């Protein structure tokens, strides 16, 4: 596997750990409010949903780390989880914020392209 692809995949996994922390633990704190442009009231009303979404982001990170841990045998695992991240990013960009296209979908697409070209 390409070192560049694995570095990008690791960065995508780290991003999703960061999303997990923001959504599960910091959603209604100053860092979470700033990151998502939320008011305290809106954050309080959506806290449970955000925590659930954060958990899913943790599963994406875990899948990518699992794929990396398998070395060359993890190719299909990495492809699967990168495609999941890409689809989630495209959906988020279409329904929530265009910024998600660049923060989530683009890194996954770059990782997927590097992986397939390796």
Role assignments for model-derived ranges:
Residues 43-59:
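Interfacial helix-start motif at the membrane-water boundary
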Residues 54-65, 106-108:
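Core segments of transmembrane alpha-helices
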Residues 24-46:
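Cytosolic, membrane-interface loops and tails of multi-pass inner-membrane proteins
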